[in-house]
Every structure is written in C-alpha cells, then in structure tokens.
Regions:
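C-terminal regulatory/interaction module of P-loop NTP-utilizing enzymes
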Residues: 1-223
Length: 223
C-alpha cells in the first residue's frame, strides 16, 4: 500500500491498523510552510482543517505528512448518506452472535492514526457533531450504542478538508465546527511548483511538463 486506504465500511480488527500505513513516501512540493504548520499541530495534538479548492493537493499533502510522521492514515470520503455509525461503528450479526465492529474513527482514536475526513461539508450536520468532543482539549469519542466514552491516544490526529468556495445555505460548516481546528490554507500551486509536480508524477522532463501545463491552463482559462 502506498497512499493509505479509504475506509468505506467499519473495521473492527485492531491488528488491521498496519494496513493503513503508507509504505513509500508520496511526492509533495511544499508551497507556503504547510509542512511545518502540520508538524506543530501533530506535536500539539491539535486538529487540522485544510482549506482550499478541489484538486489543489490537500489529499496528497495528508498522505505525505502521514508518511513523514510515521502514522497510519485512514481516509473517509464524506457524502450526504454518511452516518455517525459509519464513522463510530455498529453491531453486526456474525453467525449466531451480535458483535461490535469499530468504525474508522474509533479505530483511529484507539490506534493512533490520522483520520482524514475528506470534504467534510458533504456530510450531514448530525454526523459531524460527533467530532466536536474529539476536536477540543478533551479528545473524547462518545460511543452511545455501547455506553462508552473513549479517550484518544496521543498519536491520534483529526484532519478535515473543506472547500470554502463550495458553499450554500444548505451546505456549509458551522462556525462552531470551524473554530475548533487549526486552519491551513491551500491554493493551486505556482507554475514552477506545478511543473515539478507534473514532471515527477508523469515521469517526464521539466520542459515537457511546462508545455503540458500551458495546454491545460489554456483549456481551463487559467493564467
């Protein structure tokens, strides 16, 4: 595994946390000191909000930082049907027994992973409420169905991504949610950085990458 795993179903086996470790360093070209800011947040056990447009490198940045910090990365792609049980866990029938299966958030809290909630604004508001006690100094995860409250281990880190340009009356983050996170701003990289990224990812020379980007920018109407 080289880029972490996206969690779509609850995972209950704690030994499976190693499946979320990133084996090879993902390439990332730092732009505005974001590596240092994220490192400070991780050391201080602070949650982080990555703000920026779609396609500006937020997900690759999280993968890069998970590798640098040596922590597992559990990615959850948020959507309007995502429930609190999808994140926390649920009881499932297994043979003749009913067993509890941890969700990705619970697994990360117990095992010290970075849990990345991608495009958090897509999730229902009643779902995002469960991250509030995790995103302040309590660092607690209530599991109502089990009558338990779990305290996050030191290496657990909560990261969310948010596109400020994608807002409506129905879809936006509450201020009470935003203010709990250290915000790191992202934007599309400058041409020289973008050329380096394309050259590395496509395995072409810098000159070829620059020519490719000219074509793309012309097509998108970007300067």
């Amino acid at each position: 595994m080289s880029e972490g795993r996206t969690a779509s179903v609850p995972k209950g086996q704690e030994q499976e946390i190693d499946r979320y470790r990133i084996a090879r360093e993902p390439f990332y070209a730092e732009v505005r000191g974001e590596v240092g800011l994220f490192t400070i947040a991780a050391q201080s056990r602070m949650p982080v909000m990555l703000k920026g447009p779609t396609g500006c490198g937020k997900t690759r940045f999280v993968q890069h930082m998970a590798y640098r910090l040596g922590r597992p990365l559990i990615t959850v792609a948020c959507h309007e049907d995502l429930t609190a049980s999808d994140l926390v866990g649920r009881y499932l029938l297994k043979g003749q027994e009913t067993v509890w299966m941890d969700g990705p958030l619970t697994l990360g809290v117990k095992q010290g992973a970075i849990v990345y909630l991608d495009e958090i604004v897509e999730a229902r508001k009643d779902t995002t409420v469960i991250i509030h006690p995790l995103s302040d100094d309590r660092r607690l995860l209530p599991i109502e169905k089990k009558g338990q409250v779990i305290e996050a281990v030191d290496d657990f880190m909560l990261v969310i991504s948010y596109n400020p340009g994608y807002q409506s009356i129905l879809k936006d983050l509450k201020q009470s949610t935003k203010q709990r996170f250290m915000a790191i701003e992202f934007d599309y990289p400058l041409p020289d950085v973008e050329s380096r990224v394309v050259a590395h990812e496509a395995g072409v020379s810098l000159e070829v990458a620059q020519r490719l980007l000219v074509v793309v920018r012309d097509g998108l109407g970007r300067d």
